[in-house]
Amino acid sequence: MQNLQEKASEWSGVETNHAFAIDDTNLFQKLGLQTFINLSTNFYNRVYVDDEEWFRSIFAKSDKDKAIQNQYEFLVQRMGGPPLYSQRRGHPALIARHRPFPVTHEAAERWLLHMQQALDNISDIDHDSKIMLMNFFRHTAYFLVAGVEQKNQSLHPCKDADGRHPCKNF
Ligand code: HEM
């Protein structure tokens, strides 16, 4: 059986070592706090007015300012900066935190489209850093799709380990 990283690579088209090239450099030092605040603000400004109601509605119960803060604090921490996210929220546990939401392939592509557009609009991120960030985002988005799918299946009371549905007829 494929593990989640392998599935994420296959579905995203981004090899794991490319996704984690972010760990070979300190993007927080290079770009600074304000850039990540600007990126997350730009991203969520797009998400909350998305023309696609099905996507916008995934965020309907979340406060926009909180969502921005959650994301930029996570990114600052993940990109080599201070652990702002964990100090406030604890372990990121991203799969578990995304479980309430329909994190499908389609949702991942929509999320990535907004993130690509947000990156394109931030002039103080250099080309190489944008590529590195996007590889990390693509891989992580599909890691979440695979992880949420696996968690939902393993807790499905009518599905056994082989994926059969023993109580399908009830
Ligand atoms: C694949 C498509 C994705 C969907 C549909 C999705 C959806 C959501 C939603 C609805 C929230 C709740 C908003 C909030 O209150 O913070 C959330 C939170 C969050 N997402 Fe995503 N997300 C996706 C991908 C990603 C990716 C790729 C990352 C990281 C690179 C990410 C990182 C986060 C973080 C850090 C939070 C805050 C969690 C918390 O503290 O509760 N998400 N996401």
UniProtKB/Swiss-Prot annotation:
Amino-acid positions noted as binding heme b in the UniProt annotation, renumbered to this chain: 98
Keyword terms of this UniProt record: Heme, Iron, Metal-binding, Nodulation, Oxygen transport, Transport
A Pfam family matched in the record: Bac_globin
Induction: Down-regulated by nitric oxide (NO), particularly during nodulation mediated by Sinorhizobium meliloti inoculation.
Coiled coil segments of this chain: none
Assembly and binders: Homodimer when ferric.
UniProt-listed InterPro entries: GlbO/GLB3-like, Globin-like_sf, Globin/Proto, Hemoglobin_trunc
Organism: Medicago truncatula (Barrel medic)
GO function terms (MF aspect): heme binding; metal ion binding; oxygen binding; oxygen carrier activity
Function according to Swiss-Prot or TrEMBL: Hemoglobin-like protein that exhibits an unusual concentration-independent binding of O(2) and CO. Required for general plant development and during nodulation. May promote shoot organogenesis from root explants.
GO BP, one annotated term: nodulation
Name of the protein: Group 2 truncated hemoglobin 3-1
Top-level taxonomic group: Eukaryota
Family classification: Belongs to the truncated hemoglobin family. Group II subfamily.
